Amino acid sequence: GNAPVQMGAENARKVLKHMNRLDVPVLIGADKPLKKPYTDALDTHGRDGLGESFLENAEGPLNTESANSFLRRKLREERCSLIAIGPLTNLAHLIETDEDAFNRIDRIVSMGGNYRSHGNCSPVAEYNYWEDPEAASIVYRQMEKMGKQIEMIGLDVTRQIVLTPDLLSYIERLDPHEGAFIRKITKFYFDFHWQWEHLIGCVINDPLAVACFLDPEVCRGFSAHVEIAEEGICRGQSVVDAYDFYRRPHNAVVYDKVDVTKFFYMFLERILRCDRARLDLLDHLLRNHDAYGKEGERDIRI
């Protein structure tokens, strides 16, 4: 994903250490896309992949079982659902090595793609699908073959989930320990957004996929046939046939609207482990929260 796989695994364990949840297994998946060389996003997330926080590694060895082995074993035991917050390489490998196991996945929520919003690594492509479009294409085609729909949490909705300085200060007031941790791991990301998009704050993409998985009413959208461009100038673009031009089976639910207030209540209730009554100022803070505009777009030509 955004960081090389070993670094990403260590970062996951650093966060779990902070949460006192090192009992949660972290497994290493593919270290490169199916066909092209790997391109990281450390320019966005810092040299350590975690906002240049340079936190100490968690003690103990990494799990030696591969992500592919774990998925195959787990799906033989029971049906599962997945939240994919990176490129879809591991799921493509699963299809190629054990299609029956993949077919036992009940639900896939994927943070990736974009419908009407501009891309973040090309004019038309979002990073996760751009990084491995062949893998994304394999997964979307398999969903069509199965008669199922992947849930696409794309930039149209994630760009409306902006952690602003006011929200971060609010978190620090409510819980100085958690607030300090979040500030430390997002400072580089805040600076990146200002430098490249003149946005005061940072878009927090992945938590929206988790929120939508837990409560499908956080986002709204429509079903459509989606294909992923694998090469050329549009490489990685999620081509959404919103008007049934091709008359192909709908293999995706494309979310294009998000209840920002509902999301932030869910987000803060969980990371701060508090009830809604403590968040009495949140509505006020979100009143003018439309940092990117209603459709996740901004004019950044300045």
Regions found by a protein language model. Give the residues of each.
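Active-site rim/loop-helix segments in enzyme catalytic domains that contact anionic ligands
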Residues: G1-D48
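Active-site histidine-anchored catalytic micro-motif
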Residues: G1-K14, F54-Q160, P165
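Short, mixed-charge aromatic SLiMs
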Residues: P4-M7, L34-K35, N114-H118, E227-D244
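A residue-level signal for conserved active-site and pocket-lining positions in enzyme catalytic cores
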Residues: V26, V139, V210
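Short, surface-exposed amphipathic charged segments that create phosphate/polyanion-binding patches used
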Residues: T39-R47, S122-E126, L167-Y170, Y243
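Short, basic/glycine-rich phosphate-binding loops at helix/coil junctions
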Residues: T44-F54, Y189, Y243-Y246
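Short glycine/proline- and acidic residue-enriched helix-loop micro-motifs
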Residues: G49-E59, H193-W196
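Conformational coupling and interaction surfaces
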Residues: W130-E134, G147-I302
